Amino acid sequence: SGGQDWAKAIMKDVLTSSLADDTGILANQAYRPVVLYINGAYWGIHYIREKINEGFIAANANVSEDSVNLLVANGRVGAGSEDYQALLSYIKAHSPLNAEAYRYVCDRMDVTSFADYLITEMYCGNKDSGNIRWYRSSETDNKWRWILYDTDITYAAGENWVWFLIDPAGTGTGQNFSTALIDGLLTSGEFRQLFLERLKFNMQNTFRTDKVLARIDELSGKLKPEIAR
């Protein structure tokens, strides 16, 4: 909800969410800026955000809560993490991925969702890229899909954000999070082609410069009346 951007732009997290919403693929939290008072004391601008849980997935994907497996970070929390870890193990064991291995992976995860997630993380330069949420539902195709989450430490110059996400040593704060999934997928020519196609689409549409600047003006315009306070 922008907690680590509170003394700066205040709106980096919601900017990225609002832009990514236009992909039509990535799940992300709706938001609303509010002015907070506690016992009559003015606490400034805050954001009301949807909470990411099984109910969030159920409402956004039109499935039941009981059908949802929601994972956090490296699959260490949530039902179904064993299956995700098995998928990672398969990718590691079969890299470089040939056509058959890539089809196996595609049967278990939405690779377009993952590509759009990576492109969004790279575009905004998310320093906290290890803070991840992803899910699947047994009422759909049971494929893993990614949720855009926690993008308030973003838009800083001076870093190679592409390498930050694919570095075999790890990504995220302290490089504590594995890059095995993306590194394994990048060994597939089919995934690289998909990634380039999604990159082209998103740079020409989702993150088109005039659109991003207009969105910044729109969001900042909502905050300006409160900034002086």
Task: Please identify what each model-predicted range represents.
Residues 1-2, 18, 128:
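Trp/Tyr-centric glycan-recognition "aromatic platform" motifs on solvent-exposed beta-strand/loop surfaces
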Residues 1-10:
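Fold-level signature of zinc-dependent metallopeptidase catalytic domains
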Residues 5, 26, 33-37, 42-46, ...:
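Middle-to-C-terminal accessory/interaction subdomains
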Residues 11-25:
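Zn2+-dependent metallopeptidase catalytic core
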Residues 30, 36, 51, 63-65, ...:
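Short, charged N-terminal helix-start/capping segments
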Residues 48-73:
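Acidic, His- and aromatic-enriched active-site or binding-groove loops in soluble protein domains
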